[in-house]
Amino acid sequence: MAEKEGKKEKKERWGIAHIYASFNNTIITITDLTGAETFARWSGGMVVDADREESSPYAAMKAARRAAEEAMEKGITAVHVKVRAPGGHGPKTPGPGAQAAIRALARAGLKIGRIEDVTPIPHDGTRRPGGKRGRRV
């Protein structure tokens, strides 16, 4: 019992890290569990100068680190991660920055809970662009 008295149990404050990773950019938003309050919002384009580097893993890593620092200042200690690709008519796989962003969040000191893919998948909604014969290259 004596050893427990010295320890203070720190209450974890959970949030959600929404990572939108396309092949053009990576956007990281950290919100509360309901998604109503935004604690931090960073993108690859905010941390690099060249447009072609917005979607790179390096830009995603820098953006995720800054978002994590900003959220931790506001009291968030742990996050559930929701990864999203463009989906719909676009690619259904996340861009190159998704994995780098998750690793950067963990390295910054945030505890990672669930990792979930929330890419919108059409259940045969509208016709894809390109017409009957498809896109002829």
UniProtKB/Swiss-Prot annotation:
Domain of life, source organism: Archaea
GO biological process: one example: translation
Keyword RNA-binding belongs to the record: yes
Location of the region described as Disordered in the Swiss-Prot/TrEMBL record: 116-137
GO CC, any one term: ribonucleoprotein complex
PROSITE patterns: RIBOSOMAL_S11 (PS00054)
Record keywords: Ribonucleoprotein, Ribosomal protein, RNA-binding, rRNA-binding
Record-linked Pfam families: Ribosomal_S11 (PF00411)
MF-aspect GO terms: rRNA binding; structural constituent of ribosome
Role according to the record: Located on the platform of the 30S subunit.
Self-association and partners: Part of the 30S ribosomal subunit.
Assigned protein family: Belongs to the universal ribosomal protein uS11 family.
Name this protein carries in UniProt: Small ribosomal subunit protein uS11
